[in-house]
């Protein structure tokens, strides 16, 4: 299983240790997204920054769309299905399955590990970006609903 982590809040007033954890996760700007495996180390990092990000389990279809629409190569070159197959020797769907299963990490491929997204169309549909998802906000764990958010942001 893999998590999609999206930075929702900015950097003003962030404690130093949380800012360092954001840098380690490569979440330098708002609306940046990373795909990380479900390991003990990453889980601890996510818990530390949960008040500044939203995260959940990404599904295969959303990951394929994310790679093709917002994935980039060094030099800001766009990706296509043929280019992904040529560079990784795997079709996009199979690459997505292996990333979700934890067999491959995005950072081990030529694809840039950070996906730069738009702000969500029609907003977060919630009470704002300063409250947790469970009480009506946009922050924290949102399980499978992260896929709906990512589709609004692509």
Curated annotation (Swiss-Prot):
<dbReference type="Pfam" id="PF00327">
    <property type="entry name" value="Ribosomal_L30"/>
</dbReference>
<dbReference type="GO" id="GO:0022625">
    <property type="term" value="C:cytosolic large ribosomal subunit"/>
</dbReference>
<comment type="subunit">
    <text>Part of the 50S ribosomal subunit.</text>
</comment>
<dbReference type="InterPro" id="IPR039699">
    <property type="entry name" value="Ribosomal_uL30"/>
</dbReference>
<dbReference type="GO" id="GO:0003735">
    <property type="term" value="F:structural constituent of ribosome"/>
</dbReference>
<dbReference type="GO" id="GO:0003723">
    <property type="term" value="F:RNA binding"/>
</dbReference>
<keyword id="KW-0687">Ribonucleoprotein</keyword>
<dbReference type="GO" id="GO:0006412">
    <property type="term" value="P:translation"/>
</dbReference>
<protein>
    <recommendedName>
        <fullName>Large ribosomal subunit protein uL30</fullName>
    </recommendedName>
</protein>
<dbReference type="InterPro" id="IPR016082">
    <property type="entry name" value="Ribosomal_uL30_ferredoxin-like"/>
</dbReference>
<dbReference type="InterPro" id="IPR018038">
    <property type="entry name" value="Ribosomal_uL30_CS"/>
</dbReference>
<dbReference type="InterPro" id="IPR005997">
    <property type="entry name" value="Ribosomal_uL30_arc"/>
</dbReference>
<comment type="similarity">
    <text>Belongs to the universal ribosomal protein uL30 family.</text>
</comment>
<keyword id="KW-0689">Ribosomal protein</keyword>
<dbReference type="GO" id="GO:0000463">
    <property type="term" value="P:maturation of LSU-rRNA from tricistronic rRNA transcript (SSU-rRNA, 5.8S rRNA, LSU-rRNA)"/>
</dbReference>
<dbReference type="InterPro" id="IPR035808">
    <property type="entry name" value="Ribosomal_uL30_euk_arc"/>
</dbReference>
<dbReference type="InterPro" id="IPR036919">
    <property type="entry name" value="Ribo_uL30_ferredoxin-like_sf"/>
</dbReference>
């Amino acid at each position: 299983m893999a998590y999609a982590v999206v930075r929702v809040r900015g950097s003003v007033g962030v404690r130093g240790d949380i800012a360092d954890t954001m840098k380690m996760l490569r979440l330098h700007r708002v609306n940046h997204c990373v795909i990380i495996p479900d390991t003990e180390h990453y889980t601890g990092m996510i818990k530390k920054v949960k008040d500044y990000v939203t995260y959940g389990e990404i599904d295969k279809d959303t990951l394929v769309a994310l790679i093709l629409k917002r994935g980039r190569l060094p030099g800001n070159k766009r990706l296509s299905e043929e280019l992904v197959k040529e560079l990784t020797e795997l079709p996009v769907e199979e690459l997505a399955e292996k990333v979700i299963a934890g067999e491959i990490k995005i950072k081990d491929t030529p694809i840039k590990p950070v996906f730069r997204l738009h702000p969500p169309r029609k907003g977060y549909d919630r009470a704002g970006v300063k409250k947790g998802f469970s009480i009506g906000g946009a922050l924290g764990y949102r399980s499978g609903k992260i896929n709906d958010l990512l589709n609004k942001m692509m």
